[in-house]
């Protein structure tokens, strides 16, 4: 408890009234209503009518037609309600001897006097000692107990002190003083809130209902008084929650503050914090007597904005939204409405005087304070409009870790059927009353009935959707009374003790009267025995019409419907569901996948549970396994493993899906006569059949043993249906309860992981409710589209399953089950988000949308991080001619992938995959060109055949009009490359060198191939990454053609690219040089008798400068067998690359240099294709900053002199591929989509001589279309950045595109701004939202621009170049700066921190305190550290302390020393702590 400062000095009598701030004077006033006598007779109908207008303010005032009750009336009935508690404490001596209380009231009160406790409230901001936020006020129990007269006397004395300067204080003047005091030095006020009781007299109707005798003598004086008339009206807060038409009428239990009122006794400046009501209910507040009370409110539709303003401006903005909701729920946040108004949040004010009601509406935040001593009362109710907020309110309450109090569905159902009249004549259509009151009542009831029928239809649709799944086939009926233990089903289905009603200022304080509900019961849906449940229901036939009360209590539930705790909590959203719920448990396969990380813990847990839940079987069972439940007489409570057979035609509810495990399941683990915690499975049929055992050597048997799941038997498939085994022994696999909506989502989520076991349960009253719903639909002429669902009574095993699915009392989510592991547990997920706000992983279900964002976000803002703020400007720097292609607008059509495969007579397979969310267009060749391209399949002498692979050149994903051609790829005879070998290793064939014009016609000398090297450090699941370096000349053995040149010269410092197409091959070549650059494409028009149409040679001109080092050319073809590719696609990391070693021959000789390749770690997607038995994968590898490991080279024998050219990429070029295939088979792929993307990337160059030099960069991105390649796979691109070690610059985006002119293609160069500041969106490329069907910007797949990584130059073949990858930045070594002051050994990262430290300033960001001595600064560091150097010297005491004075005070606990004694005469009190002594002197003025 913080020390109390002395009371504020009395203001001068001549002090002027405080100036009213402009924001306060301009606040709009909430509406007020004055109902007539007839309107006042039905509060729910009246409030439902005014709610349309008043809800826009969030609050309103209702002035009753009766005068306010007298002070004597209120005090008499309030004292009576307070002393009704048997454990009412006596008033404290301190309160009785308070110097501020007059002598007449300081005498000890009688034993029977009503007393109550209070709380201390802080008002003001401390100047020091407490960091922000200062909107959170301290509230603690005072420990004092007062009678009403004592507290009134103390309050008047306090008001006289603080309002002495105001002659006649107005409401605005007091409000100005309050908000001024909230910013000044703290003062402490007392407030008695959440005191159970009422100032109303018990209504006569309630007394008759309870068969109580009226008290004639004491009540004669109150008869016909204003208080008596108001108490016997429907506005009595003791009956408002149970008023006809209120949805809270049928809440099972009496919850103080909700269904029964609570009293609030305040003094001047007693405040209540910003808050909303529990479950966002309506509240009705009545001020009995005393000073006014001011309210401020924000409408419900602006609640999210208020929460965000408080989070940012009140809590500093560093708090997670869920955590800020929890802090708001503590009801200690006091923020001026001025902050809200400045941030655009509307707010209104209202002044409540004695005898007036104040109504708050759902989701409306409100705050307020008292102008002096007063006594108020509050309770909750709900109009039909509350149903719009009920669901989200329940979820929000669960996120704040509060137990639910009610089920909105159950309350809706019971209220709707309560409107059914007992008189059958009123069910006939056409009979309408002419009374205005009755017509309004019918309108109110019509809304509830429509909501009821609509909810019935929605639940029916969910049931029908669920029954269409394979995981569930029927619905069972259950009742809470039928569970194995009546204490198993706890209130609110969470089986934990109900939370006490939280009042305006936080948790409920101890009061003089205990809660009206039993401590063993819970809140809104507390568990009730069958007798209690039936006692609350009312038989319509037994209620005579003469006993029908004025409060319409005769409209109770018909058909013996009972109010019980049949609602269960959904694990995923925290809502109490009714009447349908689903019990889910993942299948064994799904559980093993979910628990992959914690697999060992899962096994041990299962085995432990099995050992602990083994039950003996009867000796005469005659089987080693668990017998059928039909042969057992044990009770369901003692069974940990149950089986059953339901009545036909319903299938067995507990069964084992044999298909799920391919019919191979484990046998019983135990061979003795015992059963495990698993359910024993038996066949379904009219007669019992013996269980079918599975041999121990089957695969499933071993799996069963490993996973700890025994007693699993496969039923006879021919004579019985499949059954499901529920794992009831493993804590990780425990069945959990979900609402139907989230159960469907989870079922779909687990469908791909192995499936889920499901059981739908329905409350037994649903059968009656359905019959009543049909009658209501006929009455209001509502189209009731309902599909009948087969229902069956729950068996004993069903009841046992329900019982173990319900949480035990006090159950806490510790994250040990499958729901927490998958992020499906709302409480656990919110707990994790509170503990680790930086980890904001989005759960897979939809309910987190309520809390993940402060306000609804549009689609555009959702995509903000997916693209750059503005598209990078570009300019056309040249064009490439292509005489073979003529692009016309009428030949542009959307791209649809079509793959045609011809392998030795195999059937052709055409598969079309539509490209979604992209504007892809391809250009069709003209007719004459198409004729030229038609070539027969040519098989070489060695059996090689061609595979026509289409190639497209375009910028991705900016798909413009592009030109695409087929590429001839031949098969390979190398057994390593064989597609028929499923286990063949994979290597890469690389042609790297620096071609020259003289080498074009030269004879090939020798073939050099490379040996694969597998880097285990970069292996993804199911795939491998091979790094190969080739340092030999790769020359063609068969040069039969003469190159024909077509040269394109571009200006210096710019990109030079040449694009030339021939009938079967499309080549894209790009060159980048710092100096004069030129690019020459040499292509052969006439084809020889080779297996490829043309040979391509890229010539690179040397730069003018001699000191510029040579750059190496790199190119890669990646091919993988089908089996390996399957593993890659199924892998979670699909960005792995597989390679294949194939022989290479070409007409050009290339000199090779260093080759560095690395796996692209930036989340690019692997592009895969299945071609019949083979799968070809093209994946680009990152060569920038790669770590190379042990690169070796070998030579493989040259298979054929006519081997096909595979790939050749110059130092700054991109080229095409030719892949041979074995056995003379051919594979032709024709596509109208963009299947192979080639782009050349170059980053901005560092200026060395006043000019921007574009550095060496080259990229080949190839995707081979396949017959089962999905559209999404095609859209994912592989990107790499290449760094020239000789230049200090990175490559940027330079993409060559074929754009739709008739015979030329523009070459576009992107100009990057220098030193462009990186936005936060550039670092979110790996976000899960970036995957999927979102549209990416052109440079979305690029890594964030970082400083260039340095790649070491390799001088020999075996040297490994070590460099960091682009996204792993090299961290600069942090220099430590040490303090040189004597006896100080602290070090700092920066000199600024060191200088501040030497000036005796704390360097902690949240502190910044200044000290007079360095010694004090060093001692202060304990505040920010976990060091506790001082230990208690007492033997056996483990206490440690940060401060010496704390150790000294603690020692007094052991010694009993009380060194501080009061010096006032006749006091003599002694104190252990100086704070207690100081507080005592200030309180009693003992100086």
Swiss-Prot record:
Disruption phenotype: Early flowering.
Binding positions for Fe cation per the UniProt entry: 275, 277, 366
Cofactor(s) required for function per UniProt: Fe(2+)
Location in the cell: Nucleus
Alphabetized InterPro entries for the sequence: JmjC_dom, JmjN, Znf_C2H2_sf, Znf_C2H2_type
Domain JmjN, residue spans: 30-71
Molecular function as annotated in GO: histone demethylase activity; histone H3K4me/H3K4me2/H3K4me3 demethylase activity; zinc ion binding
Pfam families associated with the record: JmjC (PF02373), JmjN (PF02375)
Gene Ontology BP, a term: chromatin remodeling
EC number per UniProt: 1.14.11.-
Keywords, sorted A to Z: Chromatin regulator, Dioxygenase, Flowering, Iron, Metal-binding, Nucleus, Oxidoreductase, Repeat, Transcription, Transcription regulation, Zinc, Zinc-finger
Residue ranges, annotated region (Disordered): 1-23, 86-113, 494-555, 684-718
Biased composition (Basic and acidic residues): 498-507, 542-551
GO CC terms, sorted: chromatin; nucleus
Zn finger limits (C2H2-type): 1377-1400, 1400-1424, 1430-1454, 1460-1486
Segments of skewed composition (Low complexity): 9-22, 86-104
SUPFAM superfamilies given in the database record: beta-beta-alpha zinc fingers, Clavaminate synthase-like
Primary location group: nucleus
Domain of life per record: Eukaryota
Cofactor binding description: Binds 1 Fe(2+) ion per subunit.
Record-annotated JmjC domain positions: 232-398
Function in brief: Histone demethylase that demethylates 'Lys-4' (H3K4me) of histone H3. Involved in the control of flowering time. Has a suppressive effect on floral transition under long day conditions through the demethylation of H3K4me3 in the promoter region of the flower-promoting signal HD3B/RFT1.
Protein name: Probable lysine-specific demethylase SE14
Native species: Oryza sativa subsp. japonica
């Amino acid at each position: 408890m913080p020390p109390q400062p002395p009371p504020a000095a009395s203001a001068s009598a001549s002090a002027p009234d405080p100036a009213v701030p402009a924001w306060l004077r301009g606040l709009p006033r909430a509406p007020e209503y004055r109902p007539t006598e007839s309107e006042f007779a039905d509060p729910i109908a009246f409030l439902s009518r005014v709610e349309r207008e008043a809800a826009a303010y969030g609050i309103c005032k209702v002035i009753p037609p009766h005068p306010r009750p007298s002070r004597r009336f209120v005090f008499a009935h309030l004292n009576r309600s307070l002393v009704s508690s048997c454990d009412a404490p006596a008033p404290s001596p301190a309160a009785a001897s308070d110097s501020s209380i007059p002598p007449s009231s300081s005498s000890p009160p009688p034993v029977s006097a009503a007393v109550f406790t209070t709380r201390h409230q802080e008002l003001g901001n401390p100047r020091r000692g407490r960091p922000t936020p200062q909107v959170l006020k301290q509230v603690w129990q005072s420990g004092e107990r007062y009678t009403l007269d004592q507290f009134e006397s103390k309050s008047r004395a306090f008001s006289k002190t603080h309002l002495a300067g105001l002659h006649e204080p107005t409401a605005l003047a007091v409000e100005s003083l309050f908000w001024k005091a909230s910013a000044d030095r703290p003062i402490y006020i007392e407030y008695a809130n959440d005191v159970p009781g009422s100032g109303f007299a018990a209504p006569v109707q309630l007394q008759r209902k309870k068969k109580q005798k009226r008290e004639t003598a004491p009540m004669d004086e109150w008869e016909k008084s204003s208080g008596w008339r108001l108490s016997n009206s429907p506005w009595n807060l003791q009956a408002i929650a149970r008023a006809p038409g209120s949805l809270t009428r049928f809440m099972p239990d009496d919850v103080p503050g909700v269904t029964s009122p609570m009293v609030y006794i305040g003094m001047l400046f007693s405040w209540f914090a910003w808050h909303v009501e529990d479950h966002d209910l309506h509240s009705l507040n009545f001020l009995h007597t005393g000073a006014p009370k001011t309210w401020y409110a924000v409408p419900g539709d602006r609640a999210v904005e208020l929460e965000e303003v408080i989070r940012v401006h009140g809590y500093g903005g560093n708090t997670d939204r869920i955590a800020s909701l929890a802090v708001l729920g503590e009801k200690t946040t006091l923020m001026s409405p001025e902050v809200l108004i400045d941030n655009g949040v509307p707010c209104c004010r209202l002044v409540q005087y004695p005898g007036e009601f104040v109504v708050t509406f759902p989701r409306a935040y409100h705050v307020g304070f008292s102008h002096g001593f007063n006594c108020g009362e509050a309770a909750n109710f709900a109009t039909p409009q509350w149903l719009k907020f009920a669901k989200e309110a329940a979820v929000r309450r669960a996120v704040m870790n509060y137990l639910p109090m009610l089920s909105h569905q159950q309350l809706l159902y019971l209220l709707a059927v309560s409107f059914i009249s007992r008189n059958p004549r009123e069910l006939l259509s056409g009979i309408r009353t002419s009374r205005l009151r009755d017509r309004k009542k019918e309108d109110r009831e019509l809304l509830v009935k429509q909501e009821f029928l609509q909810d019935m239809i929605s639940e029916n649709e969910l049931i029908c959707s669920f029954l269409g799944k394979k995981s569930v086939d029927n619905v069972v009926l259950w009742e809470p009374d039928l569970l194995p233990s009546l204490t198993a089903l706890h209130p609110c289905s969470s089986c934990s003790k109900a939370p006490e009603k939280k009042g305006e200022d936080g948790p409920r304080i101890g009061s003089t009267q205990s809660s009206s509900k039993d401590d063993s019961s819970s809140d809104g849906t507390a568990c009730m025995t069958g007798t209690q449940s039936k006692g609350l229901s009312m038989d319509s036939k037994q209620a005579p019409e003469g006993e029908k009360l004025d409060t319409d209590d005769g409209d109770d539930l018909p058909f013996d419907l009972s109010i019980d705790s049949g609602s269960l909590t959904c694990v995923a959203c925290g809502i109490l569901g009714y009447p349908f719920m689903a019990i889910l448990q993942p299948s064994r396969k799904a559980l093993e996948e979910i628990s992959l990380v914690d697999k060992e813990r899962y096994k041990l847990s299962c085995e432990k549970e099995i050992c602990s839940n083994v039950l003996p079987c009867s000796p005469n069972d005659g089987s080693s396994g668990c017998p059928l439940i039909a042969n057992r007489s044990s009770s369901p409570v003692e069974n940990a493993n149950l089986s059953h057979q339901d009545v036909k035609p319903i299938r067995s509810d507990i069964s084992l899906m044999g298909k799920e495990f391919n019919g191979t399941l484990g046998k019983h683990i135990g061979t003795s006569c015992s059963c495990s915690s698993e359910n024993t499975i038996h066949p379904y049929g009219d007669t019992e059949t013996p269980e079918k055992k599975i041999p121990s050597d089957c695969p499933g048997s071993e799996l069963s043993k490993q996973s700890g799941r025994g007693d699993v038997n496969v039923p006879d498939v021919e004579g019985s249906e499949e059954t499901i085994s529920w794992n009831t022994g493993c804590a990780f696999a425990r069945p959990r309860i979900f609402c139907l909506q989230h159960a469907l989502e989870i079922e779909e989520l687990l469908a791909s992981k192995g499936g889920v076991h499901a059981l739908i349960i329905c409350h037994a009253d649903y059968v009656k409710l359905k019959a009543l719903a049909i009658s209501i639909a006929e009455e209001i002429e509502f189209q009731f589209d309902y599909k009948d669902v087969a229902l069956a009574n729950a068996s004993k095993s069903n009841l046992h399953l329900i019982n173990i699915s319900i949480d035990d009392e006090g159950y806490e989510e510790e994250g040990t089950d499958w729901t927490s592991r998958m992020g499906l547990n709302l409480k656990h997920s919110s707990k994790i988000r509170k503990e680790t706000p930086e980890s904001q992983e989005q759960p897979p279900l939809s309910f987190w949308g309520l809390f993940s964002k402060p306000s609804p976000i549009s689609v555009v803002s959702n995509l903000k991080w997916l693209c750059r703020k503005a598209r990078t400007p570009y300019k056309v720097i040249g064009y490439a001619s292509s005489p073979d292609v003529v692009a016309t607008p009428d030949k542009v059509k959307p791209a649809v992938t079509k793959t045609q495969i011809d392998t030795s007579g195999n059937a052709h397979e055409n598969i079309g995959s539509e490209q979604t969310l992209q504007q892809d267009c391809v250009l069709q060749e003209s007719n004459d060109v198409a004729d030229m391209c038609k070539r027969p399949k040519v098989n070489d002498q060695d059996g090689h055949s061609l595979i026509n692979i289409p190639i497209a050149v375009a910028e991705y994903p900016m798909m413009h009009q592009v030109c695409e051609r087929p590429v001839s790829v031949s098969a390979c005879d190398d057994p390593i490359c064989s597609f028929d070998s499923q286990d063949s290793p994979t290597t890469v064939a690389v042609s790297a060198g620096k071609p020259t014009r003289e080498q074009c016609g030269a004879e090939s000398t020798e073939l050099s191939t490379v040996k694969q090297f597998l880097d285990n450090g970069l292996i993804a699941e199911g795939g491998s990454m091979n790094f190969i370096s080739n340092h030999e000349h790769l020359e063609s053995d068969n040069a039969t053609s003469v190159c024909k040149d077509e040269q394109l010269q571009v200006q210096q410092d710019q990109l030079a690219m040449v694009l030339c197409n021939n009938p079967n091959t499309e080549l894209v070549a790009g060159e980048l040089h710092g100096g004069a650059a030129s690019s020459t494409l040499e292509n052969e028009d006439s084809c020889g008798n080779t297996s490829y149409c043309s040979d391509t040679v890229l010539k690179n001109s040397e730069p003018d400068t001699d000191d510029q080092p040579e750059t190496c050319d790199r190119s890669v073809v990646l091919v993988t067998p089908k089996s390996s590719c399957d593993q890659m696609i199924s892998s979670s990391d699909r960005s792995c690359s597989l390679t294949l070693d194939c022989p290479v021959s070409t007409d050009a000789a290339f000199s090779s240099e260093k080759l560095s390749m690395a796996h692209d770690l930036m989340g690019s997607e692997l592009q895969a294709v299945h071609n019949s038995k083979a799968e070809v994968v093209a994946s680009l590898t990152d060569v920038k900053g790669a770590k190379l490991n042990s690169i070796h080279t070998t030579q493989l024998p040259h298979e054929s002199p006519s081997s096909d050219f595979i790939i050749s990429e110059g130092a700054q070029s991109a080229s095409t591929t030719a892949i041979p295939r074995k056995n003379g088979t051919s594979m032709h792929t024709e596509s109208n989509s963009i299947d192979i993307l080639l782009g050349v990337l170059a980053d901005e160059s560092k200026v060395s001589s006043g000019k921007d030099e574009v550095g060496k960069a080259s990229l080949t991105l190839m995707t081979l279309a396949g017959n089962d390649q999905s559209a999404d796979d095609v859209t994912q691109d592989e990107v790499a950045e290449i760094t020239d070690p000789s230049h200090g610059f990175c490559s940027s985006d330079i993409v060559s595109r074929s754009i739709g002119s008739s015979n030329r293609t523009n070459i576009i160069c992107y100009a990057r701004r220098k030193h462009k500041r990186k936005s936060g969106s550039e670092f979110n490329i790996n976000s899960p939202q970036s995957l999927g069907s979102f549209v990416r910007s052109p440079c979305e797949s690029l890594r964030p621009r970082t400083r260039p990584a340095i790649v070491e130059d390799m001088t020999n073949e075996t040297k490994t170049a070590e460099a960091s990858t682009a996204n792993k930045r090299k961290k600069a070594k942090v220099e430590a700066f040490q303090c040189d002051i004597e006896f100080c050994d602290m070090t700092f990262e920066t000199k600024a921190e060191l200088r501040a430290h030497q000036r005796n300033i704390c360097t902690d960001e949240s502190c910044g305190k200044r000290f007079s001595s360095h010694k004090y600064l060093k001692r202060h560091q304990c505040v920010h550290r976990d060091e506790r150097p001082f230990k208690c010297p007492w033997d056996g005491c483990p206490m440690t302390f940060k401060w010496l004075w704390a150790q000294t005070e603690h020692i007094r606990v052991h010694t009993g020393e009380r060194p501080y004694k009061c010096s006032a005469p006749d006091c003599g009190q002694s104190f252990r702590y100086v704070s207690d002594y100081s507080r005592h002197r200030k309180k009693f003025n003992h100086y």
